[in-house]
Amino acid sequence: MSISASMVKTLRERTGAGMMDCKQALEEANGDMEKAIDWLRQRGLSKASKKAGRATTEGLIGCQVLPGSTSAVLVEVMCETDFVSRDEVFKKFVDDIVSQLVANFHNNDVDLLDQPSGNKNLSIRDLLNETIATIGENIVIGRSIKMELTPGKNGMIGHYVHTNGKIAVLVELATETKETASSPKFQELAKNIAMQIAATAPLALNSESLDPLKIDREREVYRQKALEEGKPENMIEKIVEGAVKKYLKEVCLLDQPYIRDDKLSIAELIKKVSNEIGEPISIIEFVRIQLGEE
C-alpha cells in the first residue's frame, strides 16, 4: 500500500514520533493507523501517552446541576480562538444552550438546534447563527450530555468543571437514604471524586467494566516491547502482567491512587467515608469530557 504524506503527518500528530519512524510504522502496518501506533509504542517511539487528552480546539463546556443534585447537563461549545472563548457574548450563548437542555431535560425527540432558545422567537439554530454573525468566528455545538439519578436509588450527581472550562465531569453516587445523600460528607465525597476523574481521565470504573479488547491490546504491546528489548524469555509473562497491572491501576477509577492522599485508592476512600457515615456508598457511572476530544 502506498503511504501518503498526509498519513505520515496524521500519525506524527497523534504520536509525536519522528517522520521517518512514522513512515516505517505505516509501511509495517500496511497503512493501518491503529496498528502503526502500536508498532511505535512497542519500540518506545511513541509519545502518544504524553499527548493523550490534549485538545487544541477552543471553547467552553457549560454545566448545570438541577435542584437537589439528582440530574445535571453538560454541553460542549467550540469556537476558533481563546480570545472568543473568554468573550461575554460567547459565554452567554453557552449559558443559553445549557438552560435549554435543562428546560427540556426529558425531551430527546427534538434536535437541540431545532428547540426554542430563551428568546422564544428564535430557535437554537437561529441563536447560533446570530452569535456567529456577532462574534465573527465559527461556533460549533459539540457533545451534550444529560445524567439523572438512577430510578429507585438515593444519591446525587456530583460535578466538577475545571476553572478554564475545558474539562467537565459528572458522576453518580448512590447510598441508602436521602438523609445521607444530602449530608455534607457525602456531597464532599462526590465533589472530590469528580475532581479525581477530571485530573486522571479514567477509562472505566474497574477492570471488569473495561473493554477486554483494550486490555488484550495493551498486553500485546507490552509483550512485543519486552521482546524488542531482549528480555529473558522466562521473564516476559511476568513483566507483561506487571505492566498490565500498572496500566489498570492508571485507567480504572476505583484502583487509582486518590490525588489528595495517594496512600488511599478511590475504592478505599469510598469505604472509609462509608464507614464514617454508616451506609454503603457506590459509584454508578461517570462521564468526563475534554473540549475537542473525540
UniProtKB/Swiss-Prot annotation:
Region named Involved in Mg(2+) ion dislocation from EF-Tu: 81-84
Cystine crosslinks: none
GO molecular function: translation elongation factor activity
Compartments where found: Cytoplasm
Predominant location category: cytoplasm
Keyword Protein biosynthesis: yes
InterPro entries membership: EF-Ts_dimer_sf, Transl_elong_EFTs/EF1B, Transl_elong_EFTs/EF1B_dimer, Transl_elong_Ts_CS, UBA-like_sf
Transmembrane residue ranges: none
Record keywords: Cytoplasm, Elongation factor, Protein biosynthesis
GO cellular component: cytoplasm
Family the entry assigns: Belongs to the EF-Ts family.
PANTHER family, per database record: ELONGATION FACTOR TS, ELONGATION FACTOR TS, MITOCHONDRIAL
UniProt function note: Associates with the EF-Tu.GDP complex and induces the exchange of GDP to GTP. It remains bound to the aminoacyl-tRNA.EF-Tu.GTP complex up to the GTP hydrolysis stage on the ribosome.
NCBIfam families to which the protein is assigned, alphabetical: tsf
Name under which the protein is recorded: Elongation factor Ts
Organism in which the protein naturally occurs: Lawsonia intracellularis (strain PHE/MN1-00)
